[in-house]
């Protein structure tokens, strides 16, 4: 990943964090889940480790170049889902391929 892409990604992660926080005080009913934004980008683990946000490689087959994005998500039910979806929409708006990994407990 080149320096320009890295800077763009850092700004996009800050924007995603802000977008998610808009739902921080929303209703948190529903089932427990581990929904998390995911971004697809070619980068090394060393590059991603230097970001201000914790980003962890998804090691599963079919998830090539995908990374879990651990921005602060509050709650464990529908609030967490809304926050993860808002973060993913923000990453997409900033030009990255992103989505949400949905997992219920």
Where are the language model's segments positioned?
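N-terminal leader/targeting segments
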Residues: 1-57, 62
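Short, compact, well-ordered microdomains
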Residues: 67-105
């Amino acid at each position: 990943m080149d320096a320009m892409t890295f800077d763009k990604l850092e700004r996009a992660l800050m924007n995603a964090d802000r977008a998610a926080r808009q739902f921080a005080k929303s209703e948190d009913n529903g089932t427990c889940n581990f929904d998390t934004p995911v971004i697809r980008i070619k980068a090394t683990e060393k590059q991603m480790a230097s970001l201000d946000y914790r980003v962890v490689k998804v090691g599963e087959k079919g998830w090539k170049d995908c990374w879990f994005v651990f921005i602060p998500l509050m709650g464990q039910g529908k609030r967490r889902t809304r926050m993860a979806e808002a973060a993913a929409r923000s990453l997409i708006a900033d030009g990255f391929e992103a989505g949400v990994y949905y997992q219920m407990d």
